[in-house]
Amino acid sequence: MVAVVLAVSGMLFTSCVKEGDETIVIPLPDGKIPYSVISESLQDSLLANGFTINEGINPPNIEGVYLAAPLDLHYASDGYSNKFYDLTMTLTGQKMRGMITYSEMQRNTVLGSSIEAQVIGHDSCFTMYCYQYISENSGATQLWKCKIVTVVSGISTDDGFRNCQYSYIMLDREAINDYYLSQLAAYETFRIYYDGDRLAEKIR
């Protein structure tokens, strides 16, 4: 286990915002990631360490199911260096104002869903960001759970996301014991991953 740890939390929580509603958690986008979601200094750190943020108010439609494999660690602000498991990302219900529903899965035991997710970008370039809860269970036992900000960037093509990059920032975490807690990122640290073959394949 261990690699998994993109720090995230236990209760699955999917956005119930409908077309025409105001957002509940994340401000409506103006083509940039709001500093209330990711601070200016953290955005600067992401950029400085190789993560791309595609800004703009006309992002492409990125609905679909995508497989990022292999997902390679590019940078970890907490010094983490272990393996990361392949990631399945599901994006549905994209609205004109950029709202979308996002969920992810690793190894069938690590599941996460967005509270709210939004897409910004231009032409075929996009960045999706959201608050997310993720957890890992073993049978009826929850091993750990976390709350994170997740960010995914890339170029949307018929084959999938080219130059796919995945990052998360830890907001809150808890675990069943010290071992699992030690595998989770510390508060406000972040990790950046690249798809190893530079394509998160569209599988549905």
PLM region spans:
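Bacterial N-terminal signal peptides that target proteins for export
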Residues: M1-A3
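C-terminal motif of bacterial Sec signal peptides marking the signal peptidase cleavage site
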Residues: M11-S15
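Amphipathic/hydrophobic helical signal segments and adjacent flexible N-terminal regions
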Residues: V17-Y80, I192-R204
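Residue-level detector of short, conserved catalytic/binding motifs and their immediate flanks
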Residues: G64, L87-M89, V152
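N-terminal glycine/threonine-rich, aromatic-flanked beta-hairpin/loop signature
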Residues: A68, D72-S114
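Short, cysteine-centered beta-strand-loop-beta hairpins and adjacent loop/turn segments enriched
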Residues: L73-S81, N108-L111, I134-C146, M170-S182
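Contiguous, well-ordered beta-strand patches that form the walls/edges
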Residues: Q94-F161
